[in-house]
Amino acid sequence: MARGNPRKRAAAAKDKWKMKEWYIVYAPDFFGSKEIGLTPADDPEKVIGRVIETTLKDLTGDFTKGHVKLYFQVYDVKGQNAYTKFKGHTLARSYIRSLVRRRTTRVDGIFNITTKDGYKLRVMGMVIAYRRIQTSQERAIRKIIQDIIYKKAEELNFADFVLQSVNGQIASEIAKEARKIYPIKRAEVRKIKVLAEPSA
């Protein structure tokens, strides 16, 4: 089947690209409304719904937070500015692999929670113990992860829960309690996913 003149196709593609404009993408207010990237589109409606990935290091300048990946979704465009809401976060796989070594125990917990202001989230907590631990100790540590995450959800609104998760405050509380059961290497809130926002 004929494909047409390659030069014409290239020229058409070039013209289409020229028609696109660049939109500046901003993080939500609770991340300081900082610029997190640029995205091109020939229609502002096409920008809405796009998901932008960045890291906590890029937002804060803290070089120890390069492994914390953040995801923001565009929900509104005004002029050349695109505004986002937080969709989730995760830790880089390479970072998690660096924590999980031979003869350690990884304790995971996955919980569906509702924040004080009605956001429904799926939260994954993780504790790494220095040695192989007993099943009873593993259960006790998982219960600690669960109790602290649920307690924080009851106390905090969505923005504060997210910030305390990504900056390590909730993980520090988990680590403090888990060490009463067994010496641990690290505690993390390794993933958050927004399941639903409160109805208007």
Curated annotation (Swiss-Prot):
It comes from the Archaea. The keyword Ribosomal protein applies. This is Small ribosomal subunit protein eS1. One of its GO terms (cellular component) is ribosome. Disulfide bonds: none annotated. GO terms for biological process: translation. Keywords: Ribonucleoprotein, Ribosomal protein. GO terms for molecular function: structural constituent of ribosome. Belongs to the eukaryotic ribosomal protein eS1 family. InterPro entries: Ribosomal_eS1 (IPR001593), Ribosomal_eS1_arc (IPR030838), Ribosomal_eS1_CS (IPR018281). Part of the 30S ribosomal subunit.
